[in-house]
Amino acid sequence: LVGRLLGLKISRIVFASFFSFIVPLFRSKKIIKENLNIFSKITPNINETEIIDSMWKNYGMTFIEYTFLNYFKSKNSYTTIKNENLLSQIIQEEKPVIFVSGHFANFEIMSMEITKKKIPLATIYRPLNNIFLNPFMEYLRKKYICKNQIKKGINGVRHTIEYLKKKHCIALMIDQRVSEGEKINFFGQPALTTTLPAQLSTKFNLDIVPVYIQRDKYHNFLVEFKERLNPSDFKIKLELSEELNRILEKMIIRNPNQWIWTHNRWK
């Protein structure tokens, strides 16, 4: 309600400031510092203060943008798509692909833009820890982003396969730690990593499409669809998962200010 009263532009400024100045007072800085320490060993001379401040501001803007998802859904002026021809190819081929990305900028924009192109899609999501907020977020995602929401977990894998058999593409974030994953190098440190994209890609012979998302200085979005990965180019599934981590690293290096450094990625 506050966001609607203020409008999108003012709401972004207000919530970016709130998350930048107030929220860090109640959140531990330990994990962020540890993560940036790992990152700095690969990319020295980073400005930690700028990265942390920008991250919190992006958090705030993303949070309030959930109340404006209908704007983003109904208009194309907020988003620029790079390599859009790849989406046209996917539509013509009528064969599913697996879209993967990380929590960059407003990460929900990826699935929204794919569905706006009329590509059948199901997205895998991780429920929020907040049991009161989670139902509302699920409602917004189903209404404005993608109606086919798959809850992460064993049952989610089964539902994912069912959607693939119905020729739906799958979208998921691959940058968070998963207890059932394998330890794969990420910025030079072993990190529990989801192998689901590689498993599905290999089993069903599906291409994987990495997607980069960025918020520009005007707070519009760039959604860049990267070159496809074909499972036949990799000897084993582990190699494919390793390549996905390398691609993710490049995305983070490209714009570390808009990635979520609060997640305990290397636990």
Please place each PLM-identified region on the residue numbering.
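Active-site metal-coordination segments of metallo-dependent hydrolases
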Residues: 28-31, 130-131, 191-194
